[in-house]
A protein has these predicted regions:
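A cytosolic small-molecule/anion-sensing beta-strand core signal
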Residues: 32, 52-53, 74, 99
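Glycine- and acidic-residue-biased ligand/ion/polar-headgroup-sensing regions
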Residues: 46-57, 75-76
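Cyclic nucleotide-binding regulatory module and flanking cytosolic helices
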Residues: 1-28, 84
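A small-molecule sensor/coupling module
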Residues: 91, 110-147, 151
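Phosphate-/nucleic-acid-contacting segments
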Residues: 146-189
């Protein structure tokens, strides 16, 4: 939990009262490679995960049974199915550990309690959501505007260690290309 407080302290002051309260309502969890944290179609309350170590991805399985990677998450990133987390509906995405992971797990009710008691943490969280929103929009624009090779090099720049962890079809689906196209791009490096 100390790593999380150090992460917060980079941007805001966290006193001992805030640390104690956060520690009482948010859980540190360890998961193994291959563990599924959220399952597409899941209807119970969903959690949000802050990554301390490891690599995760969110993905959707389409009507033909094909997986499409939506997001990768690395150290100091958050991951969830935000449509369900904020909208209270069924999960549209699954979240999978691509390696052994240590995460901070928070449900919506607990995090709202933190925000009520410590408004400066809510401001910090909103700023992080804004960064995530920008990152998501950049990904959409790049997907529409860039060719596959440029999208691949952006991916390598954004996630330098992900290729050693993610399977080829994870990376290819994230880029919106086939595994064969990914192999061709890599061979041209």
């Amino acid at each position: 939990m100390q790593d999380f407080f150090e992460y917060l302290n980079k941007s805001i002051d966290i006193n001992d009262e805030a640390k104690a309260f956060i520690s009482s309502v948010i859980k540190m969890r360890e998961f193994k490679k291959g563990d599924i944290l959220i399952t597409q179609g899941q209807s119970k309350a969903l959690d949000n995960y802050f990554v301390f170590s490891g690599f995760l991805r969110s993905y959707i399985i389409d009507n033909d049974g094909k997986e499409h990677t939506v997001q990768f998450a690395i150290k100091d990133w958050w991951i969830s199915d935000y449509i369900a987390y904020y909208g209270k509906g069924e999960a549209m995405l699954s979240v999978e550990c691509l390696s052994d992971c240590i995460v901070l797990q928070s449900d919506k009710i607990s995090i709202e309690k933190v925000f009520e008691k410590f408004p400066h943490i809510e401001t910090f969280h909103r700023k992080n959501l804004e960064k995530s929103f920008v990152r998501l929009n950049k990904r959409i624009v790049n997907q529409l505007q860039l060719n596959a090779r440029d999208r691949y090099f952006n991916f390598i720049n954004d996630f330098p260690k992900m290729e050693s962890v993610a399977k080829n079809y994870h990376v290819a689906s994230y880029l919106g290309i086939t595994e064969q196209s990914l192999s061709r791009i890599r061979s041209q490096e």
